[in-house]
Amino acid sequence: MTGLIYNQHDIPKDVYRYGLRPSAQTGCGWIATYNALKLLGCTTDIPELIRYFTWQLPVIHGNLGTAFWAPRQCFRKWGFDTELIFDRRRFDEKAAEADAGIVFYHWAGKRGTGAHFVALQKTPEGFTGYNTFRNSTGPDCWGTSVDGFLRQHRYFGCVLLCIRKK
C-alpha cells in the first residue's frame, strides 16, 4: 500500500498545519482518516480533509487535536457503514470484520498524558497499524490482538471505529 502516512512527525512544520499547530503535533485524527481512506482504496485531497476537520469537527479548531467521534462522522457522511466499539473485549472480533478501522486511545508517560488516533487493518499476519509511534517508519505490527497490543502498551480510554466499504 503506497501513499500512507507512517509517521506524522515526518511532516514538515510549515506543511499541513492543523489549526494553529503543525500536523506533527495534533494531526493524528485527520492522518488516521486519510490512512483509512487509502486502506479502503479511496483518494482524498489532504488540504481539503484538514479544512473539513478544522472547521466542522474540531477541538478548538484542531489546536487540541480531533474529537474521538469526528472520523466516524466523516465516514458516515461519505456513505460508509461504521460502528463505534467501546468494549475492548470486542475489538479483535470487530476489527477483523472491518475493511479498515481507526483506534483512538489515551496514553500516559514521561511526557505527560495525551491521546492518539491510528488507522488499522487486519492482515494475514494479524493487525497492522499506521502512524502508531513517534519513531514509526512503516506499517506497525500489532500482533494477533488489538486489545492485547493496547494492554501491552498500557493505553486506556480506547475506542475502535470499524469501517466497511460502501
Regions found by a protein language model. Give the residues of each.
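Active-site-adjacent structural segments surrounding the nucleophilic cysteine of cysteine proteases
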Residues: M1-I60
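Conserved active-site-adjacent core of cysteine acyl-enzyme catalytic domains
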Residues: T2, T43-K165
